[in-house]
């Protein structure tokens, strides 16, 4: 793998901070653009690395990419666009106009700047929430019908459609499974992480939609999967969509609870057969394409994620895990 100059928008976030570390380990030059909405402590460890550069900027600004690039270094080869408002609760909290501004218009803005700079490829983080459940109950794949059931998913589809219509930098789209695991900026508003936190601190869990299936992926494996998009043959990769996860990561909520009970057997679990909130996903996803075309296989399991989360909480490595900064929607509306 040859050294590349890669721009990561949202690089101080949950996925971005681990992706930055992974890219630096691979020998790449990394420029992170982030407005530091959730703080910048996740980036501090990189500042002594000569291949790391940081710019505080908002991706909605017209020259945010152009003005963020370090001087006297080659132009970027790739932009990995992670920045935006992530998750249906956060998007609901700020409304459609703001969601479109940050998730659709900002994507267009960064892509247009990348095109003007002669960037070769543009990797985009989307979500598997865009799918409708299959009619036969089987797993959905990249060709399955789209049926967004949240404002967040709607905004991701709109951004995807824009990117796939462009002729500039080759867009490569990754529809991420639900992420879990520890990172420099951990989130506790995601299913596995939130379940473990509530089980550990409250010794009880209240579970809605117990039999609903979802697909899960460890945040470290997300970083690995995105990095595989850097070396896919350019013309073959252009406009491709990849579900990013693994078949082994398809779990029901009941199965996740069983993994938690294995490590916290004293907890009390209460089930309610209600459809609760705005996120009604009950879906199984196929990840054959990313395994076949990019060679991706997950290295960590949901059980690994539960283990590391319990350990981090028991040892006090995460102080005040109920702080709003660990939850996208709560922090944004403060």
Report residues per predicted region.
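NAD(P)-dependent short-chain dehydrogenase/reductase
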Residues: 136, 149, 161-214, 219-230, ...
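C-terminal substrate-binding subdomain of Rossmann-fold SDR/epimerase-dehydratase oxidoreductases
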Residues: 203, 207-334
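Residue-level signature of the cytosolic catalytic core of signaling kinases
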Residues: 48, 57, 184-188, 249, ...
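Conserved donor sugar-nucleotide recognition element shared by glycan-biosynthetic enzymes
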Residues: 151, 155, 188, 253, ...
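Generic structural signal for alpha-helix termini and adjacent loop/cap motifs
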Residues: 18, 94, 113, 134, ...
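N-terminal Rossmann-like NAD(P)+-binding domain of SDR-like oxidoreductases, especially those catalyzing
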Residues: 1-170, 175
């Amino acid at each position: 793998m040859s050294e590349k100059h890669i721009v990561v928008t949202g690089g101080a976030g949950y996925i971005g901070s681990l992706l930055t570390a992974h890219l630096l380990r691979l020998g790449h030059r990394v420029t992170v653009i982030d407005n530091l909405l959730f703080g910048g402590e996740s980036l501090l460890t990189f500042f002594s690395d000569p291949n790391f550069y940081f710019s505080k900027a908002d991706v909605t600004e017209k020259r945010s990419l152009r003005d963020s690039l370090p001087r006297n270094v080659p132009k970027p080869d790739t932009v990995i666009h992670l920045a935006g408002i992530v998750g249906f609760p956060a998007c609901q909290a700020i409304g459609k106009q703001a969601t479109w501004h940050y998730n659709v218009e900002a994507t267009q803005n960064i892509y247009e700047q990348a095109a003007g700079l002669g960037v070769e490829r543009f990797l985009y983080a989307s979500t598997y929430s865009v799918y409708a459940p299959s009619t036969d109950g089987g797993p959905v794949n990249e060709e399955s019908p789209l049926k967004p059931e949240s404002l967040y998913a709607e905004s991701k589809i709109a951004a995807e459609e824009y990117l796939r219509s462009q002729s500039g930098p080759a867009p490569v789209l990754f529809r991420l499974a639900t992420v879990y695991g520890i990172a420099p900026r951990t989130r506790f508003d995601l299913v596995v992480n939130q379940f473990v936190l509530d089980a550990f601190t409250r010794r009880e869990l209240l579970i809605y939609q117990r039999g609903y299936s979802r697909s899960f992926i460890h945040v470290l494996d997300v970083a690995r999967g995105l990095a595989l998009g850097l070396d896919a043959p350019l013309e073959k990769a252009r406009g491709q969509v990849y579900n990013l996860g693994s078949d082994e990561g398809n779990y029901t909520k009941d199965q996740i609870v069983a993994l938690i009970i294995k490590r916290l057997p004293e907890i009390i679990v209460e089930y309610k057969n209600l459809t609760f909130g705005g996120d009604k996903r009950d879906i199984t996803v196929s990840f054959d394409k990313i395994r076949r075309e990019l060679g991706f296989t997950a290295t960590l399991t949901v059980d690994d994620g539960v283990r590391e989360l319990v350990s981090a909480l028991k040892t006090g490595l995460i102080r005040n895990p109920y702080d709003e900064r660990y939850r996208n929607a709560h922090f944004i509306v403060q």
